[in-house]
Amino acid sequence: MELWRQCTHWLIQCRVLPPSHRVTWEGAQVCELAQALRDGVLLCQLLNNLLPHAINLREVNLRPQMSQFLCLKNIRTFLSTCCEKFGLKRSELFEAFDLFDVQDFGKVIYTLSALSWTPIAQNKGIMPFPTEDSALGDEDIYSGLSDQIDDTAEEDEDLYDCVENEEAEGDEIYEDLMRSESVPTPPKMTEYDKRCCCLREIQQTEEKYTDTLGSIQQHFMKPLQRFLKPQDMETIFVNIEELLSVHTHFLKELKDALSGPGATMLYQVFIKYKERFLVYGRYCSQVESAIKHLDQVATAREDVQMKLEECSQRANNGRFTLRDLLMVPMQRVLKYHLLLQELVKHTQDTTEKENLRLALDAMRDLAQCVNEVKRDNETLRQITNFQLSIENLDQSLANYGRPKIDGELKITSVERRSKTDRYAFLLDKALLICKRRGDSYDLKASVNLHSFQVRDDSSGERDNKKWSHMFLLIEDQGAQGYELFFKTRELKKKWMEQFEMAISNIYPENATANGHDFQMFSFEETTSCKACQMLLRGTFYQGYRCYRCRAPAHKECLGRVPPCGRQDFSGTMKKDKLHRRAQDKKRNELGLPKMEVCQEYYGIPPPPGAFGPFLRLNPGDIVELTKAEAEHTWWEGRNTATNEVGWFPCNRVRPYVHGPPQDLSVHLWYAGPMERAGAEGILTNRSDGTYLVRQRVKDTAEFAISIKYNVEVKHIKIMTSEGLYRITEKKAFRGLPELVEFYQQNSLKDCFKSLDTTLQFPYKEPERRAINKPPVGSTKYFGTAKARYDFCARDRSELSLKEGDIIKILNKKGQQGWWRGEIYGRIGWFPSNYVEEDYSEYC
């Protein structure tokens, strides 16, 4: 067996790789193992599996998203721990770039083999590799691997299932504390019985939690005051006493509400305390530092360590340490929406259900706020790592916003025309251009993105030539500029997308709507959005604030904030609507020319400032011009595929020419003129997913799709106008083949919520083939959700949503409060409290 396959088997035995990972599949290649290990996360977890707590996972970035800086940091943590705790010699270790750039993957396998033979690893009872009779000559298969590695690949989420989760540890402590003596469950429970159980659980767990806060104060804070300095006490206990005060009052009002008839006033208590629970913002943002400081003090002073053990013994017979108990408040505040969700599920009265939904929304919003504080703490740790590695940096990197992407590139400038190797860090507001010196970086230039724009340049690109893929970074005044070169076309696209996202964060759509001047802003206090009343989340740059009236808002809510300095804007909305209708009518009367998109455009370069929003274009889209001058390079138009209006470079389109009528009879799905009854006769005895497209007999210019789904035949009208075909207003196609091809790959549920299927089997295909053929382009997903609010992505890994969008849920195992989903072919993370799952009423 090849050495890399033996390594794979060993990693599976060490519970690092899932047994079903694609690297184990027939036909798997060594590059798939390299891709799985490149970010260093699994290697760090490997050491912890072999020797518990060998690495503090707080020092590891568990979601590096192929950031070269973070991946290399993880890899170097693995290598240093191999030496310090496993006794490997320096000569047995690979270099960090041997793995990240896959320069010598054979050396990586050699290091893992040496690790497998260490006494610590062998004590686990796992067979090391290679075995004595194994051949070692795998060198040929490792050559050229660096060209096969995909720097733009999405993370394989299943890979991280085995990684330890500190949140799960805190959850176990919480569940242990809240556990009550098991009460026999009646064999048959009514909905009323289940509701009573929910109410009882809410009260009992709140009593235990309040007792826990009291125990921390009584058995730890008071005794430790004589051992610790005031600043140590404040750092370790944060605002525990404030939490205790809030929950003492909350518990009293909770009991009063629960003792009332039917507990109908319970919802008011949660809504009232949402604002008071904002004190958790401070606690959750500082608890990690608190635990770290506690560990440091206990390690440095034996008397404190002994006192902590004594306190723990008195508080709970030594079951839980202070470190354990400090994790509980974070867990409790994240449980309220789950408790209320279950209560809503078993509440029958319509009015009560609606009221409880209000409380549920309030607690979901609070939970999302807490989760974002945790996420921003992780981001700030990442920024700190960047800061410590960059020399000549004269201000805090956090002032530039959140990191977008980092990596190697080549660069030319106005002053220096020859290509220079550089390492760049892109954040929301700035691009930092550095020269790498070993493990540190020397800052050469800081580009303020406020005054720059990006322009694509594909003129010199050749697919087979590295570092030929370039775009321009140009100052608005034209005095300064850079050419940025990337190794591959895919990397260039990834960087351009992140530049587009950064610029859209600085200059968001609707930033000047209703007379406002919205700018990115870091709020010191927890604040609610002026438009939707939901909380602005996180610890820095949580949203936007109007420079004039100081109104706070989410990015996605900017267009809905009342006019600057005025309270009511319903009249403005009405006027805008009437104006829009008049414009549409005028456009139709003029019969302006149509253009076909020949090159995609996603807002880079952005239109000149005075023009307006950009228009997103995809090849094949049809654009109806609204403003166009032959001598101007920027035109305005309406994309008939999306109905959006905006500006775009005129070189991205060409005149639209109606082609000759297509011969549809060549397609296996086309049935010609046919009534509904005829389609039903053909499809009734066929497999689910079998479909046909028919010409409607009553109107030969119209078409329809008939499809077998859930034992019934469904019919979908295809609307035709302006030479385009569509089954929903959201998306249009130039021809029927394009429409059919799209819905072969994308579920019809995006248009019709009860029709969760793709167009799978053309009716002219023999049934035998149709049964064996897997669904085309189907992605494994776990139900769907409907967006309740708009959401604007902040970076490339997030998914923008519009209210009413239907999202396929791919994963719920990411950072708390975030799910991974797919919509319109895009995949990314979105906040779970912005959606309603499976069209149910929260449950």
Curated annotation (Swiss-Prot):
Post-translational modifications: Phosphorylated by FYN. Phosphorylated on tyrosine residues by HCK in response to IFNG and bacterial lipopolysaccharide (LPS).
Indicate the segments forming the SH3 domain, all copies: 590-658, 780-840
* Alphabetized PROSITE patterns for the sequence: CH, DH_1, DH_2, PH_DOMAIN, SH2, SH3, ZF_DAG_PE_1, ZF_DAG_PE_2
Please report the stretch or stretches of sequence annotated as the SH2 domain.
Answer: 669-763
The record's annotation in SMART domains points to:
C1, CH, PH, RhoGEF, SH2, SH3
Stretches annotated zinc finger (Phorbol-ester/DAG-type): 515-564
- Pfam families linked: C1_1 (PF00130), CAMSAP_CH (PF11971), PH (PF00169), RhoGEF (PF00621), SH2 (PF00017), SH3_1 (PF00018), SH3_2 (PF07653)
Q: State the UniProt keywords alphabetically.
A: Guanine-nucleotide releasing factor, Metal-binding, Phosphoprotein, Proto-oncogene, Repeat, SH2 domain, SH3 domain, Zinc, Zinc-finger
Give the multimer and partner information.
Interacts with SHB. Interacts with APS, DOCK2, GRB2, GRB3, DOCK2, SLA, TEC and ZNF655/VIK. Interacts with SIAH2; without leading to its degradation. Associates with BLNK, PLCG1, GRB2 and NCK1 in a B-cell antigen receptor-dependent fashion. Interacts with CBLB; which inhibits tyrosine phosphorylation and down-regulates activity. May interact with CCPG1. Interacts with CLNK. Interacts with THEMIS2. Interacts with NEK3 and this interaction is prolactin-dependent. Interacts with ITK. Interacts with PTK2B/PYK2. Interacts with HCK. Interacts with PTK2B/PYK2. Interacts (via SH2 domain) with SYK.
Which molecular function GO terms apply here? guanyl-nucleotide exchange factor activity; phosphorylation-dependent protein binding; phosphotyrosine residue binding; zinc ion binding
Function recorded in the entry: Couples tyrosine kinase signals with the activation of the Rho/Rac GTPases, thus leading to cell differentiation and/or proliferation.
Query: What domain notes does the record hold?
Result: The DH domain is involved in interaction with CCPG1.
Q: Where is the Calponin-homology (CH) domain?
A: 1-119
Q: Specify the domain of life of the species encoding this protein.
A: Eukaryota
Any single Gene Ontology cellular-component annotation: cell-cell junction
Coiled-coil residues are none
Positions of the DH domain:
194-373
PH domain spans which residues? 402-504
Name of the protein in its database record: Proto-oncogene vav
